[in-house]
Amino acid sequence: MAAAVAAPLAAGGEEAAATTSVPGSPGLPGRRSAERALEEAVATGTLNLSNRRLKHFPRGAARSYDLSDITQADLSRNRFPEVPEAACQLVSLEGLSLYHNCLRCLNPALGNLTALTYLNLSRNQLSLLPPYICQLPLRVLIVSNNKLGALPPDIGTLGSLRQLDVSSNELQSLPSELCGLSSLRDLNVRRNQLSTLPEELGDLPLVRLDFSCNRVSRIPVSFCRLRHLQVILLDSNPLQSPPAQVCLKGKLHIFKYLSTEAGQRGSALGDLAPSRPPSFSPCPAEDLFPGHRYDGGLDSGFHSVDSGSKRWSGNESTDEFSELSFRISELAREPRGPRERKEDGSADGDPVQIDFIDSHVPGEDEERGTVEEQRPPELSPGAGDRERAPSSRREEPAGEERRRPDTLQLWQERERRQQQQSGAWGAPRKDSLLKPGLRAVVGGAAAVSTQAMHNGSPKSSASQAGAAAGQGAPAPAPASQEPLPIAGPATAPAPRPLGSIQRPNSFLFRSSSQSGSGPSSPDSVLRPRRYPQVPDEKDLMTQLRQVLESRLQRPLPEDLAEALASGVILCQLANQLRPRSVPFIHVPSPAVPKLSALKARKNVESFLEACRKMGVPEADLCSPSDLLQGTARGLRTALEAVKRVGGKALPPLWPPSGLGGFVVFYVVLMLLLYVTYTRLLGS
């Protein structure tokens, strides 16, 4: 009899002993241990039947014990072929562990557990998750080490789920419905057969992500929005983007690489894109934690300026392409005058392209502020009638567009045609936008400014203005007190003191002021002169490339404008001209080959400061935005620095015709003398 009882104990465990043994046999302690566990469950609310090799739930437990108050049930390490029916009747159950059993399917009665928040089904033989599992208020779902081939589409209905572990399964893809898990913090898909990760994962507030030991070759760019991510595990994957050397450096380098890719992909849409794609905009913390103040404790440290602060400023690398700057540039360019629109439409059939960077550069705002301060009382918006302020604001976007290098030739031809048709130097172009009392003032200022531009010497005009101001020249009366006659094409404007001359906000004036040819006499203002030929930006770029390659002793990239925009080459040039003039240079790393806009601007500002220390006049310097955008004025500043400090003057951009003829004559004469000398020696 004892041998007959020992065999069931070895084969079937304690449950077999409890059901086949008789009182007094060795199986009695197993029954007593199960009964003791049930008694403790009634007293404590926690049922622990783990590691007992049970195939069935203890019989008669529901009739003998009141288990309605059980909140935690541990049925792990047993041999249940399915979820016990008695466990599905525990309506107060909040946590259920069926770890390491023999489950092949789940009982539909699990849907009765309306208070269940924790469910552990790992180390079983499940091949699918039924839909009724997704109707439970689960916060933790663990189904690792099973045979799941796919997740159900209803997985997105688990809105309160915070941890999902589906590791060590046979998943080949993840459903896009995962984006519905708005509370998910921990996602573990380790040891599956995943080849791609859905883009929607970037919208989740994940803190921990593990997709190691899969077949993933590319991390989605949208993952750069996972700003709360603390841990990311991606080993044992054939990753190609980001490269392996980037992934080995850690989480910060991975996210910087993804942020750079996102910026390049956003800028590749072109200026005609209506706005930046919403998939690259960082989600605010208030959307993830409504009603709570977010203190940055879960940030990843990406793009942090201070190494001690683990704060990811996700907007810092995308300020220039944000939707706010796009709307500002749109509002600044909409209220343009009808004549301006007509000229744009007749001269160029292409639509007006939007320049995100040019519309919101701090350097341009500072330059515009200095021009406003130097404006005389007649032309300032606050001195006379307040209604003239909108008109002056309408004309500013046109001046911004004229400074673009690609429209230089177009605006040159347009200015020349208008001046030839007007019959007088500097006839105003936008008379229809101004009041009659202001037309003569603007016309006179434009006339004197245009004549000063023809002289090719804005510096002399400024010096004359300063001299006149120092001698106490009388200031003209405000335009609002006495209306002036309208300036026509045949009437020349009355002479005005040079101290009140206003610099026009014109690209042609800036170009001519950069290539001034010397001081001009007072009577030269009334004498028309031939236009100086404005140097082409391509010629400037070619000459600057030759100078930089000869100075730095190394070849430069093909796209020199983009290389100069980072400011690294300019700072190296300054240090080559005068050692230690730029003490600190921001250089790109192999992982992130492109500098951020903030670091590039700091390099450019350091170069301009070094130029000031080397003796380059302030009038020959440009704003940081000119160097960042690669305009002709910025290129000329770099050449001027080499010219001032390099010890020898640069070759001129266009040699004078008289000098060229003399050079040709001299070369021909030397050749004739050489031929004559050789013939004399031969004879």
From Swiss-Prot:
The chain crosses the membrane at residues 653-673. The modification Phosphoserine is found at residues 279, 281, 304, 307, 309, 313, 432, 457, 511, 513, 517, 521, 589. Residues 1-34, 268-292, 326-436, 449-539 are annotated as: Disordered. Residues 449-460 have a biased composition (Polar residues). LRR repeats lie at residues 41-64, 67-90, 92-113, 114-136, 138-158, 159-181, 182-204, 206-226, 227-250. Its main location: membrane. Residues 534-647 form the Calponin-homology (CH) domain. It is a single-pass membrane protein. Coiled coil: none annotated. Residues 1-18, 461-481, 511-524 have a biased composition (Low complexity). It comes from the Eukaryota. One of its GO terms (biological process) is positive regulation of toll-like receptor signaling pathway. Pfam families: CH, LRR_8. Keywords: Cell membrane, Leucine-rich repeat, Membrane, Phosphoprotein, Repeat, Transmembrane, Transmembrane helix. InterPro entries: CH_dom, CH_dom_sf, Leu-rich_rpt, Leu-rich_rpt_typical-subtyp, LRR_dom_sf, LRR_domain-containing. One of its GO terms (cellular component) is PML body. It is found in: Cell membrane. Residues 330-345, 357-376, 384-418 have a biased composition (Basic and acidic residues). Accessory protein that regulates signaling by multiple TLRs, acting as a broad-spanning regulator of the innate immune response. In macrophages, binds LPS and promotes proper docking of LPS in lipid raft membrane. May be required for lipid raft maintenance. This is Leucine-rich repeat and calponin homology domain-containing protein 4. The gene is LRCH4.
